[in-house]
């Protein structure tokens, strides 16, 4: 009798454990034909598209009742609606080389090297395999990488990271917190050939010869619910019950020199922008005053511009996003949680009753 009873106990443990695991994390989706990857974790879903290099993210519970969708009918098997107003999307729009005064430079007629890319969204990106059980700076995460060759032989790479646990990460001089469900994307430009007025010939914005490139402006198209995203500090975030993002272990009294900039993007979500870049993966260089620059271009559309320093090697920028629970879902979440908890409790009670009866 002992062996059957032991087997039943193990079966019970396995079954109930599977219920818990299923409720914690949803499965990912990879479609290599369409070149799309969907990563899920910690009530966050991220869609990565190889065609155009678009990255979208939103709050998502696999078992929620679709009440965050205002423009779409409910379906029996709910899927993420990345066109929902609470979703955020990011896409590299353009790259433009500029001189020391910030004016564009362009290729001369004798040069075959391009010094701007005006439609990055038309490029085809290669999509790496999804790493759904990896780490980033010792934190559990999922990652996928997009890569495209630019017309001037430079390379554009986007590494998308979805964190699965809370922790602290570093980017150059900046140390800040990430949450389970934080999504970040490294943007790496490698091998950009700058105008030097000699070996690489360029024209100024007014078609004057011997122009010299000094920086590279990389622009992102951003879609978010907030029409005019507001910069918020940790004190203001604390008013809504959010923990500090900034971490400065060297000098707690320093005036946030080593802290990223945080924007409220609407829908309880926020974007975290570093003030500097990494050159050749090791040297932290602060961006010029006024950058990164976020400006409104439409009702929900924004243009986010980073000014990158001149280098023959690589430059990395590192935006991240904390997805919050949409306000209209907050009141409904408790009901959903209670329903899920009640179902698990009922299932456990039923199985324990059967177990007791067998003994």
Curated annotation (Swiss-Prot):
GO cellular component, one term: extracellular region
Tissue: Component of the acid-insoluble and acid-soluble organic matrix of the aragonitic skeleton (at protein level).
Region ranges (Disordered): 60-83, 224-254
Superkingdom of the organism of origin: Eukaryota
This protein's UniProt keywords: Coiled coil, Secreted, Signal
Coiled-coil region list: 66-89
Subcellular location: Secreted
Chief localization: secreted
Residues in the signal sequence: 1-26
This protein's name: Acidic skeletal organic matrix protein
Organism of this sequence: Acropora millepora (Staghorn coral)
The organism's taxonomic lineage, starting at the top: Eukaryota, Metazoa, Cnidaria, Anthozoa, Hexacorallia
């Amino acid at each position: 009798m002992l062996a059957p009873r032991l087997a039943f106990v193990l079966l019970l443990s396995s079954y109930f454990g599977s219920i818990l695991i299923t409720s914690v994390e949803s499965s990912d989706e990879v479609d290599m034909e369409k070149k799309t990857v969907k990563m899920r974790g910690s009530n966050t879903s991220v869609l990565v598209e190889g065609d155009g290099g678009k990255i979208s993210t939103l709050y998502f519970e696999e078992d929620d009742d679709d009440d965050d969708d205002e423009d779409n009918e409910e379906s029996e098997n709910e899927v993420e609606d990345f066109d929902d107003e609470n979703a955020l999307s990011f896409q590299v729009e353009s790259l433009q080389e500029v001189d020391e005064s910030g004016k564009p430079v362009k290729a001369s007629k004798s040069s075959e090297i391009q010094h701007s890319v005006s439609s990055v969204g038309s490029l085809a990106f290669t999509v790496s395999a999804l790493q759904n059980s990896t780490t980033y700076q010792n934190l559990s995460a999922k990652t996928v990488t997009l890569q495209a060759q630019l017309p001037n032989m430079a390379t554009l790479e986007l590494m998308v990271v979805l964190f699965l646990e809370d922790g602290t990460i570093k980017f150059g001089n900046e140390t800040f917190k990430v949450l389970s469900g934080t999504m970040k994307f490294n943007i790496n430009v490698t091998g950009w050939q700058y105008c030097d007025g000699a070996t690489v010939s360029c024209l100024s914005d007014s078609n004057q010869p011997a122009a010299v490139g000094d920086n590279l402006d990389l622009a992102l198209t951003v879609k978010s619910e907030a029409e005019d995203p507001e910069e918020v500090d940790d004190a203001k975030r604390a008013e809504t019950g959010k923990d500090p993002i900034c971490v400065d272990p060297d000098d707690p009294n320093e005036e946030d020199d080593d802290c990223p900039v945080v924007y409220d993007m609407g829908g309880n979500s926020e974007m975290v922008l570093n003030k500097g870049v990494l050159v050749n993966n090791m040297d932290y260089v602060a961006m010029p005053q006024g950058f990164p620059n976020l400006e409104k271009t439409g009702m929900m559309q924004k243009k986010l511009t980073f000014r990158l320093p001149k280098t023959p090697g690589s430059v990395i920028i590192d935006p991240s996003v904390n997805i919050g629970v949409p306000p209209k879902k907050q009141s409904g979440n408790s009901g959903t949680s209670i329903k899920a908890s009640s179902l698990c409790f009922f299932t456990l009670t039923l199985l324990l009753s059967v177990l007791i009866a067998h003994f």
